């Protein structure tokens, strides 16, 4: 994908930075692979509205020039005006700092609680899916459900901005589209890729569905699936299943 070069004579701050994102490739070596960290950065750059290019990296056949660019580093990583950056959390902080208003959107959540909502889900899911002992399955599933319930409660609890102090009407349930409001933030870029993996993998290898009664989570996922920033940066369900084919353990007596 070609980058749009800035025109000569523009002020330095008006020039588009040269950004290339390197993400994990799928099983075919070309499509987007299963990597929530790759998707996290992909979503951030897309939401920022900045011009950037994306290169999928086949870990089985990593090209020599990429090994020289970031020796010993697996995707995701970025080059920003030819400077290599490899730490995902630091990349997120850097992009939020340099790609700032008024030219680019601010993506930090307004409510600190949005940053930690759902943070325990992936660890509980990993323990659940890697377990091979039938006698431990029920307790591990309960642990996963408990963390999902906590997220569901957060998504259904009105944020301060949804409550009108002058209104006589008591808002009992939130209708917001995402974690921090009606627009995606950095918190969504972190959680949504992981939540999607949980949904796909738990169904495939444990026949587990996120309960339909968790209306906050299902509203959240439905809204995410309606956004290009999520669906176009997301690996296919098949890629996610392939990635977990050796990780997900069969329950054996």
Swiss-Prot record:
Record-listed N6-acetyllysine modification sites: 24, 130
Expressing tissues: Detected in brain, in cell bodies and dendrites of Purkinje cells in cerebellar neurons (at protein level). Expressed neonatal and adult cardiomyocytes (at protein level). Marked expression was found in hippocampus and cerebellum, and in many other tissues.
Regulation of protein activity: Channel activity is redox- and pH-regulated. Anion vs cation selectivity is enhanced when fully oxidized.
Placement of sequence motif G-site: 35-38
Reactions catalysed: chloride(in) = chloride(out); thiocyanate(in) = thiocyanate(out); nitrate(in) = nitrate(out); iodide(out) = iodide(in)
Modification Phosphotyrosine occurs at: 244
GO molecular function: chloride channel activity; oxidoreductase activity; protein-containing complex binding
PROSITE patterns: GST_CTER
Alphabetized Pfam families for the sequence: CLIC-like_N, GST_C_2
TM spans (from-to): 37-57
Topological type in the membrane: Single-pass membrane protein
GST C-terminal domain location: 81-244
Record localization: Cytoplasm, Cytoskeleton, Microtubule organizing center, Centrosome; Cytoplasmic vesicle membrane; Nucleus; Cell membrane
Entry-annotated residues carrying N-acetylalanine: 2
Enzyme class: oxidoreductase
One Gene Ontology term from the biological process aspect of the record: multicellular organism growth
Stored SUPFAM superfamilies: GST C-terminal domain-like, Thioredoxin-like
CDD domains (UniProt xref): GST_N_CLIC
Function field: In the soluble state, catalyzes glutaredoxin-like thiol disulfide exchange reactions with reduced glutathione as electron donor. Can insert into membranes and form voltage-dependent multi-ion conductive channels. Membrane insertion seems to be redox-regulated and may occur only under oxidizing conditions. Has alternate cellular functions like a potential role in angiogenesis or in maintaining apical-basolateral membrane polarity during mitosis and cytokinesis. Could also promote endothelial cell proliferation and regulate endothelial morphogenesis (tubulogenesis).
PANTHER family: CHLORIDE INTRACELLULAR CHANNEL 4-RELATED, CHLORIDE INTRACELLULAR CHANNEL PROTEIN 6-RELATED
Domain comment quoted from the record: The active G-site contains a monothiol Cys-X-X-Ser motif which mediates glutathione-dependent redox catalysis.
Name listed for the protein in its UniProt record: Chloride intracellular channel protein 4
Species this chain originates from: Rattus norvegicus (Rat)
Gene name tied to this protein: Clic4
